A protein has these predicted regions:
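Short, compositionally biased leader-like segments
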Residues: 1-12
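Short Gly/Pro-enriched turn/cap motifs at secondary-structure boundaries
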Residues: 22-23
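Long, compositionally biased intrinsically disordered regions
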Residues: 158-162, 166-252
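Acyl-donor binding region in acyl/amide transferases
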Residues: 10-11, 18-19, 28-30, 36-181
């Protein structure tokens, strides 16, 4: 696992490996390139980012609420694996996605998160791209939490989005409250909120443009009592190492 701050190397591998459009999210980001120690060949990419603040199926299973997430700042102790990409033919022929997803739980990533941002990382979210049948199923360290509601708005072209985004910045009085929380931090999914407001102002019914793609939701708890910690029931000193070998390179 090689952490990188080089967008050129990371983006080149990603563009040549995966067809899905990707744009770095606002907030925390750790990028990794996975390299085979023997051959030196690229095996895949990982991005660990600020977690999505609201996914109903996950939040119900964990049992935390907005006070836990924001007042107690437990959302900073969780992250999302927003990129899990194997290179080919590793991905298709050798179940490479399962390997890369398993490496997301490594101690190196947890240590990097704590060193970079000052918060202990106790678990990671991810979602499948299409539907709930996914390569993440059957990985012992990832728990299926349910599915998303499929209520993400379809994005207009980048050209049209930039035009209307700039217009909102200059002309819409409520722009700051649209993309920022009361504490001044960027809300989860700011682009979706901007698109929703664009549609409303243009007289377009947003619900007509949901993609209706229910994605599988997965969570990897790093400790036996991760959920209790996220609910604010215990402190860091009470976290118990997981017995399933999560993050252990030998077991992966």
């Amino acid at each position: 696992l090689k952490r990188t701050t080089s967008n050129d190397e990371f983006n080149t591998i990603r563009i040549l490996t995966h067809s899905l459009h990707w744009k770095q999210n606002v907030g925390r980001n750790l990028k990794y390139i996975i390299v085979d120690e023997v051959s030196g060949r690229y095996l895949g990419l990982i991005t660990i980012a600020s977690d999505v603040v609201s996914i109903q199926s996950r939040d119900t299973k964990i049992g935390w609420d907005s006070d836990n997430k924001f007042k107690q700042k437990k959302i900073n102790n969780s992250a999302i694996a927003s990129t899990i990409v194997p290179t080919q033919p590793l991905g298709y022929n050798f179940l490479g996605t399962k390997l890369i997803a398993s490496l997301c739980t490594s101690q190196q990533i947890r240590d990097d998160w704590e060193n970079e941002y000052g918060d202990k990382l106790v678990g990671i979210t991810t979602t499948s791209l299409f539907g709930s049948k996914s390569a993440y199923n059957g990985i012992r360290w990832w728990k299926k939490m349910g599915t998303t509601e499929g209520k993400m708005l379809l994005s207009p072209s980048e050209q049209h989005y930039k035009f209307w985004h700039n217009w909102l910045k200059e002309n819409f009085e409520g722009y700051d409250s649209l993309i920022k929380t009361e504490g001044g931090t960027i809300v989860s999914g700011p682009k979706q909120k901007i698109i929703n407001k664009m549609f409303q102002l243009l007289g377009i019914t947003p619900t007509n443009y949901f993609h209706e793609n229910n994605r599988g939701v997965y969570y990897s708890p790093f400790f036996n009592n991760t959920y209790q910690f996220l609910r604010g029931e215990i402190g860091e000193e009470e976290l118990e190492p997981h017995s399933n070998g999560v993050g252990d390179y030998e077991k992966i």
